[in-house]
A protein has these predicted regions:
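N-terminal helix-turn-helix DNA-binding core of bacterial DNA-binding proteins
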Residues: 28, 38, 42, 46-89, ...
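Short amphipathic alpha-helical segments with heptad-repeat character
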Residues: 31-34, 38, 42, 87, ...
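N-terminal leader segment of winged-helix/HTH proteins
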Residues: 1-55
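Generic C-terminal helix-cap and adjacent flexible tail
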Residues: 165-171
Length: 171
């Protein structure tokens, strides 16, 4: 068993110790990992929101713009592909595309291969805004991980990938 110094203890260690005292009949070991993941997720969410706000973007706007950016030149996708990439409904995606178009971040054009369809693409403004926000986000994420060396980051990424695999598998 690992003995921790007071400096190495964190709020989760105190939480786990309290539950072990109050409910010794329960295995509270999952809290060691998942409470820390939950706390980190809150810090990441704050970092993401700060990066996006600095570039006048909402999280949902960033999600749509990055889906287009990752598509590569000409940074263009169908609304159906966008909704699958962002896991929202058709009505929600239509509303989001409308709002992004009004803001001058995306444009629509007829799909030359499907007369009934449209394609959505980044404008120059959308491209520069998403690129700047993404660079800022990565800077903040590097700060969040600064307590871990590169090897530990790779190990953690591998463990988290294993943990997430059942949830990310196609149904």
């Amino acid at each position: 068993m690992c003995v921790m110094t007071e400096e190495a203890r964190d709020e989760v260690d105190r939480l786990v110790a309290a539950w072990r005292t109050e409910r010794p009949d329960l295995d509270v070991e999952p809290l060691q990992v998942l409470s820390r993941v939950s706390r980190l997720a809150k810090h990441l969410d704050r970092a993401r929101r700060a990066a996006f706000a600095e570039h006048d973007l909402e999280p949902w706007e960033f999600d749509v713009l990055t889906a287009l950016r990752r598509a590569g030149k000409p940074y263009e996708l169908s609304p159906g592909t966008l909704l699958r990439a962002t896991l929202v409904t058709s009505g929600t995606m239509t509303n989001r595309i409308d709002r992004l178009a009004q803001a001058g971040l995306v444009r629509r054009r007829p799909d030359p291969e499907d007369r009934r369809g449209v394609l959505v693409s980044l404008t120059d403004t959308g491209l520069s805004r998403v690129d700047a926000a993404f660079a800022d986000l990565l800077r903040r994420e590097h700060e969040l991980l600064s307590g871990l060396g590169a090897a530990d980051q790779r190990t953690l990424a591998s463990l988290l990938r294993t943990l997430l695999a059942p949830f990310d598998s196609p149904s």
